[in-house]
Regions:
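Sec/Tat signal peptide C-region and signal peptidase I cleavage site
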Residues: 19-23
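Bacterial N-terminal signal peptides
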Residues: 9-18
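Alpha/beta-hydrolase superfamily serine-hydrolase fold, recognizing
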Residues: 27, 31-60, 64, 76, ...
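N-terminal secretory signal peptides that target proteins for export/translocation
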Residues: 1-3
Length: 342
């Protein structure tokens, strides 16, 4: 079992210890498809995490859960960086903590380009180093320098803290290089936040990044969209909106309208957006979030492509670094950004 799969198992166990699972039962079982790699089949075959129906009731309970997640998730990251030959430097931009990940074999063509990574975690999980696995994989496989923004999160810092911090880092990057040399990417919450950054930059009159890659983006924080229902229980990562996920949406929103485009970018005006690449899976709870955003972008005349992985639940493309699907995903992101960044 590789490092990321070990980390995910440890994280799920820790979360179970921190908060007992609810009593809800999941729907029917599903066969594991034989049309995917053995590594992905192993992920698909896993039972859903028992903590999916956890409902922390206080800020301290949310913090306990987040801290447990961070502690376990961070354990394997030094080994992953070593395996992929990725260096790391800690710092800050505009007062926001950042990690800079640089592949040892950074191509000459990418030396003056940079990607901004916004991590997932429902606006409550993934603080510090614990959320950096996607950034490491992108640096190591996609061969770009990646700036990871450690943005503030709920419950201590609800909306608009996350997007404010993302914008602060983006503005700082614009001071060092033109937007045509900057790409933005993220998964889940980070995918949604990448799109929100584009909306916010447009509203502020800032140049938009050269390209955006939004993996299984959380584009609608309300329980709207077919796959919230059809993939409930089929997705063995998020499982259901009615677990901790819906609580996290309301916690971060802090009483604001969940359909505000600064929370749910699928309701925003996407005209003028840069080329955008979206990714999902056939079992992903956020498949409709992704498909709806793809259509919204295309309707606005934006060059937008959509990749849907067979059998994949939410964001499983960065949970097994040796899976062919993972290698394809991050190589494809590298090709996408190479095509659109100057």
């Amino acid at each position: 079992m590789n490092r990321l799969k070990q980390a995910m198992s440890a994280v799920l166990l820790t979360c179970v210890v921190a908060f007992p699972a609810g009593a809800r039962e999941l729907p029917r079982p599903f066969p594991v498809p034989q049309t995917v790699s053995p590594e992905l089949r192993e992920l698909i075959a896993k039972v859903p995490p028992p903590h999916w129906d956890t409902h922390p009731g206080t800020a301290q309970e949310w913090k306990t859960w987040a801290d447990a997640f961070s502690k376990e998730a961070a354990k394997t990251l030094p080994g992953l960086r070593e395996k992929l030959k990725v260096g790391v430097a800690k710092g800050e931009l505009g007062g926001v903590p950042v990690f800079t990940f640089t592949p040892k074999d950074l191509p000459e063509a990418n030396r003056d380009r940079v990607l901004l990574n916004l991590h997932g975690g429902g606006y409550v999980l993934g603080q510090g180093e614990s959320g950096t696995q996607e950034a490491v994989l992108m640096a190591g496989i996609g061969k770009f320098r990646v700036i990871y923004a450690d943005y503030r999160m709920a419950p201590e810092f609800p909306y608009p803290a996350a997007v404010d911090d993302a914008m602060t880092v983006y503005r700082e990057l614009l001071k060092t290089k033109p937007a045509q040399k900057i790409g933005v990417f993220g998964t889940s919450t980070g995918g949604g936040l990448s799109l929100i950054l584009g909306l916010r930059a447009k509203a502020e009159g800032l140049p938009l990044p050269a390209a955006i890659a939004a993996g299984t983006p959380w584009t609608d924080l309300t329980k709207t969209g077919d796959s919230y229902f059809t993939n409930e229980g089929m997705d063995n990562i998020l499982v259901s909106y009615d677990g901790w996920l819906g609580d996290a949406a309301r916690l971060y929103a802090g009483g604001h309208d969940l359909k505000d485009p600064m929370l749910s970018p699928v309701f925003g005006d996407m005209s003028g957006f840069p080329p955008t690449l979206l990714t999902s899976g056939t079992r992903d709870l956020f498949l409709s979030n992704t498909a709806r955003m793809h259509l919204k972008l295309r309707e606005a005349g934006v060059p937008a492509d959509l990749i849907v992985f067979e059998g994949m639940s939410h964001a499983q493309y960065h949970m097994a670094e040796d899976a062919p699907e993972t290698r394809f995903h991050f190589s494809e992101l590298g090709r996408f950004f190479d095509a659109h960044l100057q």
